[in-house]
Each structure stands twice: as structure tokens, then as C-alpha cells.
Amino acid sequence: MTPQELAAIATIDLMPRHEPRMVYRCIGCGKSFELERLLYTCPHCRALLRVEDENFDALKSRSGAQWRKVFDLRRALDVEGLKGIFLFHELILPHVPLADVVYLGEGHTPLVRANRDLAQWAGADFFVKNDGQNPSASFKDRGMASAISFLNHYIRVKKPETILGICASTGDTSAAAALYLSYLPKGAVRSVVLLPKGKVTPQQLGQPLGSGATVVEVPGVFDDCMKIVEQLTENYEVFLLNSKNPVRICGQKSFAFEVAQQMGWKVDDVTVAVPIGNAGNVTAIMEGFIDLLRLGIVEGLPRVLGVQSHHANPVAIWKEIGRYTPMTVSPSVAQAAMIGNPVSFPKVKGLVEEHFRDRFDCITVTEQEIMDSMMRVNRHGHVVCTQGGEAVAGLRKALAEGRVAKGGRFVCDSTSHQLKFAGFQDAYFEGKLEEGYGVVSKPELVNRPVSMAADAAAIAAGLGLKPRKRCMCGGN
């Protein structure tokens, strides 16, 4: 449906008209810098930056109810730039024209209710938001859609020489970055990713290679790769694609917008369970809900439950003892969250202290709980990754310990697709998970192929089928 056809029915203008004043804002010293630059930390105090619209209050000329109507009706529009996360254009990067938006099918992922058996096991009815159904099969596509749309606009306006896009990754970021960069003209950009050697799944390694990126394997863990990338962004003209780049956070806020929309724009009774790695995602989710609250689109904030493995849980320890200390991680099946010094932790701390003080918690789960949860959830109609298993395990534990009340509604963020982590499932079935994970396969969750003769009667007997009763009635 065209904007004109829908507007005639809706009696409200659905196209973006907002005139923003976009800046980088330092979360440390508070200084602002024009957004038409490639900045990742404050030039004055080196603190992290966030993207801010200094004309945000102009959006309040519409009521919260009117904004809800706009966002709901835009789903029916046949406008490519508004099909993905930029449906919420005014709340993402409103200075980027729709013509510069890069849309590869990201966003609007399903919210799937747990069936009765799974809800009973978890301790409450809950939903899984399956971000593994994004184009590169992870939530990182949300941030890449905003970052690469920003870059596409930057290239058109500034006309720079070839830009090198770079990221450190545990697998999902590299896949998304390489995919979205590959959509831009080859003469305009180059794509490079740094991965910790031997610490990503074969599927995740294959994705950036398939998209044509230069893949550099580095000894160590993600934190080692990130240090190198930070040095490169400080000293060379490159475009950072990790969540330290605030324009990436803008796109990841869309997760919060979609959850609110899918839950009927009422979230004050909702708890969102989020696996935490580099902490960019939980930062974006909290910022997204704050934006909705500021415009009256929602009337209250949800609870946010961060979840971390006991092999990489600096945020959970901070929440428990009130002191943050980076840690050396141990191997985790939740590889995308195996990060001992989350880059975005300062943002998390600020958001919790200012907005989510009594609405944020972070819980630690074991590797055993993560794997058992993933295996069980996927036996009940879902396709969650190990991080999704981590989120559900965290919700189950929080319910059992009374850290969240059972009377509310619950959403678990499955950040990636099961198939990216199929190797962990296979190793669980075979009882061959590496000793460092500390996971023992539970017989009731193990499933292996069964060999039978190529004979219908033999297979029927093996399956315990009973012969069908013959109908003795007559016919014409």
C-alpha cells in the first residue's frame, strides 16, 4: 500500500518529517560533537559516546497514542526504507534519508510463546524473541543496518576514498558486518574482521569468508582482538563496527521497540532476559525503552534481567558486590558472550544508576544450565542458540530464586540461530563436549539416529506401530 493510500485511511501522516539535530554526546564529560564525523570515543576525555538528537523533544508534538498508531500502520506501507528497523526511523538515525537506508530483511523477528510443557519446566509462561531469524542469523544485523546505513549516507555526502570497515568478533558481529558491507559498492569499502583463532564455530567462520571479507585469526580471546581493533581505530582511518561505535547501538534499540509493539505497547509488567557479552545489546535495549517512555509511547519501563555464564560474568559480579573488575574468561558454550571486559559496561552502569536502579538485575548461570536449557527449549518448537539457552536458563533460575515475580510477562532474547551452534548440540549428543566447559550430557536430552532395515514391516515393528483395523463396510 502506498503512503497516500494508507494516509487516506489512517488520517495521519505516516512518512518521516522530523528535522533532527544529531550529535555524539560524551557519557563522561558531556561534550557534544557533530555526527558527520567518524568518532568512537570522546576526543577530550576518551569516554564512550552515545548518539543524541538535540531536537528529540520536537517529537512530543505527537502524543504517545499517535506514535503508536504511526508505528503500527507503517507495517502496511510499501516503502523499502521503512520495512526493517527503520520503521522506527525517528528513533534510530533520523538524519539518514530513506534512500540511503540499507535494508537486507532485518528486524521484526517473531515473538514465540513457550508451549505448556516448556513453560511448566521454566516456572512461568514466557516468550522467545528469535533474533536468529535476521539475515546473518543474529541480532547483530540490527546494529549493522543502522551502522551501514549511516556509512552509506556518509559516503554519499562526504565522498571519501575507500573506507575500511573493521570489527573484532566472537562470530556473530563478523558475519553481520561482512554481510552488510558486501552490499555497498566494492570500490567504496573494504571489509576486515578479527577473530580469536579456534574460538568461533565453523559456521560463524564461514559466514564472513562467504561475504568476501578479509578474515584475520588472532591468538587469544575476543578481548585480545578488541584491543587490536581499538588501536587501529585510534591511529588509522577505519570505520569501527563493534558496539563501541554508537551508531550501531541506534539500530539495536529496535529490539526494544519491537518487543513493546508485540506486547501491545505495555511493558511495565514485562521482564526481558538478555544474555550479556560485550554489553552493547543490553545497553541498546535499555536506551530503546527509555526513548519510548520519553515520548509517552509506553507508560513505564520493563525489568531487564542480564544473564551471564559463570565463566564470563563481570557484570553479574558488579551487580552483586557493587564493584566492577574485568576478568579472565574460561571457555564457554555461549561463545558470543565469552567476554571478560565488556566495552559498553560504562553505559550499562550509567543507565542502571539513572533509570533502571530497581528494574535491572544480572544473574549467573552454569555452563551445564546453558546447554541443558538450549537442548530442552529446542525440543519444544524453538531454534535458540547457546546464548538463547543462557537467557532462558537465567529466567528459570531467577524465577526459582524469587528474583523476579511470577505474575508478570517474560521475554527471552535468543540472539542467534541454533544452526550457528550445531556443533555444540552434536558434541552434547555424543558426550564429547570439551572438559573445560564442565558439561555432562543428560540421557533424557540426548538424541541419536537409529538404524533400521529398509523394510516397512521392520520399521513399523521398531516404532511400535499397531496394524490398522480393516473396514468391513460395503461400498458402491
Model region roles, listed by residue range:
Residues 1-476:
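PLP-dependent amino-acid enzyme catalytic core
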